[in-house]
């Protein structure tokens, strides 16, 4: 991982990690009520950002892999939120859907940039990502 990519990934991990941790400590416990394991899951997801930030700052491969995994999970959740809003759901419960749409779109963009800067978009193919996929099928 190059120095500029590590710097960009560290900055994006700090931004998204701060937002996820703030949501986990402030918003999720009040929103989920009795479903406290969901709030704990959001808090752990926020803390995982800072663990990946530590790994990337040290230049280790596990930090890059954790940052890629966080980008995939966060991007998937953000895309699911945009899809829910497109289907007329109001996941934030407020009168204005535009604020929620902007927040979810911003989060999706941040996780997309995090995935790119952490090195997921390398076009190495399916074989490198998955060890169980048979090699001869990839040469069709």
Language-model features, listed with the residues they occupy:
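Topology signature of small-to-medium multi-pass alpha-helical membrane proteins
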Residues: 1-140
């Amino acid at each position: 991982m190059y120095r500029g990519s590590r710097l960009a990934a560290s900055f994006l991990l700090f931004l998204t990690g701060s937002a996820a941790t703030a949501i986990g400590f402030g918003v999720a416990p009040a929103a989920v009520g009795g479903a406290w394991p969901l709030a704990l899951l959001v808090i752990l997801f926020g803390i995982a950002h800072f663990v990946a930030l530590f790994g990337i700052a040290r230049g280790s491969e596990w930090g890059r892999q954790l940052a890629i995994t966080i980008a995939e999970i966060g991007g998937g959740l953000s895309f699911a939120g945009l899809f829910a809003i497109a289907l007329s759901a109001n996941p934030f419960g407020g009168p204005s859907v535009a604020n929620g749409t902007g927040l979810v779109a911003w989060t999706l963009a941040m996780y997309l940039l995090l995935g790119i800067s952490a090195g997921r978009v390398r076009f190495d193919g399916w074989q490198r990502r998955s060890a169980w996929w048979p090699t001869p099928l990839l040469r069709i």
